[in-house]
Every structure is written in C-alpha cells, then in structure tokens.
C-alpha cells in the first residue's frame, strides 16, 4: 500500500470536479480531528463537457488524467479511488415522505432505515437514478421536527426527505471517463451540496441560507433551514 511519510493510502480522499471549463483534482488528508486538509491540487482546461454533461469522452478523459497528473506532482502516493462531483440540467429533486410502524415501540436503527427506504418509494423516470437521500425531519406519532429519533418511544415513525436524482447516461459517461484513467470511482456527490459542506457553518444552516455555485456551464443552488437541505436546483 502506497504511503506518504507515515500516512497510509486510506488516510487520503481524492475528489474530482469535472466542470464545463476545467477539471480540478483535489487530494485531501484526513486529520486527527476528522477534518480534511488539502495537500495537492491539479487543474486542466476542459472541452469535453457542455452544461455539466459529457459530450466528448476522449477530451474529458484527457482533462481528468492531466488534472490528476498535476496533483500527483506534489503527492507522494498513488491515486486509486476517487469521488466525483456532479451537476447539470439532468439533476432533478423532490421532497418525499414515508411512514412505518415502530416494531418494539422504541425507534431502532432498523426502523430509521425502513422509514427512509419507504420515503424513496416514489415513481421516478426510468432514465433517472437516486443520487442522494437527504433526511429533513422525523415525526413520531404527533411529535414533529425531530432530528434524531433513535431511542425515542412511539407507535408510528414518519420521515421527510429530499431526494436528488440524476440521469443514468450522464453517470455512465462520467464513470467511463474515470475508469479509462485507471482509477476506481467511489461515488458521486452533488456539486452544490459538496460546496455547502465546505463553506457553510452550522449556525448558517440552522437559521436558513442558500448557497449559489456559479460554474462555467451551470449555476446550482442548495438551500438549508434547521440544518437540513430542503431545496436543490
């Protein structure tokens, strides 16, 4: 396993922002306080995307590879796994809810999983897939605005969630480009959601805030109230 000093490979997170105007590769080191410290960055102009969607496989692959090569110039390790930010007009979202009975009259992790799964049981177009399920609040019997229901007593558990979906073909084309570069794709993250994690404070998300991510081909937003994402565009 590749190392950088005394750090193991799994102490690093690699992220790709595959944008319309450029591709950026970030390598972050996980600190003892569970924060991420950026240790390497690579950037290369992109010509293979339009409005966040791949329109040229070869050009996109080349930009990804060259951005990673730049990042590796200051990183003593091997890039094997990566998370990719995703945006574009193919991203859709909706709010949904689910209801289940609480099996043993006390909420368990299994109950939480079931009620979130129930909230996902909505019809989405066959050419779309679920990207994120973002819990907003839980309701136990008549008590609402619950953020963490684990261990609470009740009979009926409800969940309100924000669902984000993306086009299957958009995902598949990005996967193809990443795999051509010889690395494993760990997952996708909605671009504006990733941006909000890095720039918004807990107080801002509690009081209510909207972040606007202006890119070369798309402008994307996410709004928060009471610490939860309620709308994404």
What do these predicted ranges mean?
Residues 1-22, 26-211:
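Nucleotide/phosphate-binding catalytic cleft detector across ATP-hydrolyzing
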Residues 23, 217-221:
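Short glycine/serine/threonine-rich phosphate/pyrophosphate-binding segments
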């Amino acid at each position: 396993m590749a190392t950088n000093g005394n750090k193991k490979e799994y102490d690093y997170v690699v992220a790709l922002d595959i944008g319309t105007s450029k591709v950026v590769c970030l390598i972050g080191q996980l600190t003892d306080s569970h924060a991420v410290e950026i240790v390497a960055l690579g950037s290369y102009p992109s010509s293979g995307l339009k409005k966040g969607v791949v329109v040229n496989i070869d050009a996109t692959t080349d930009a990804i590879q060259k951005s990673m090569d730049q990042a590796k110039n200051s990183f003593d390790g091997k890039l094997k796994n990566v998370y990719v930010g995703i945006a574009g007009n193919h991203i859709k979202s909706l709010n949904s809810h689910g209801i289940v009975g609480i099996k043993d009259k006390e909420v368990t992790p299994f109950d939480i999983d079931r009620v979130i799964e129930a909230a996902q049981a909505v019809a989405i177009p066959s050419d779309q897939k679920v990207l994120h399920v973002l819990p907003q609040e839980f309701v136990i019997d008549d008590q609402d605005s619950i953020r963490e229901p684990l261990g609470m007593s009740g009979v009926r558990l409800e969940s309100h969630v924000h669902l984000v979906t993306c086009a299957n073909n958009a995902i598949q084309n990005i996967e193809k480009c990443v795999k051509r570069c010889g690395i494993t794709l760990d997952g996708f993250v909605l671009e504006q959601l990733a941006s909000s994690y890095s720039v918004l404070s807990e107080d801002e998300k509690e009081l209510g805030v909207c972040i606007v991510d202006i890119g070369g081909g798309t402008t994307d937003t996410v709004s928060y109230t009471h610490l939860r994402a309620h709308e994404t565009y």
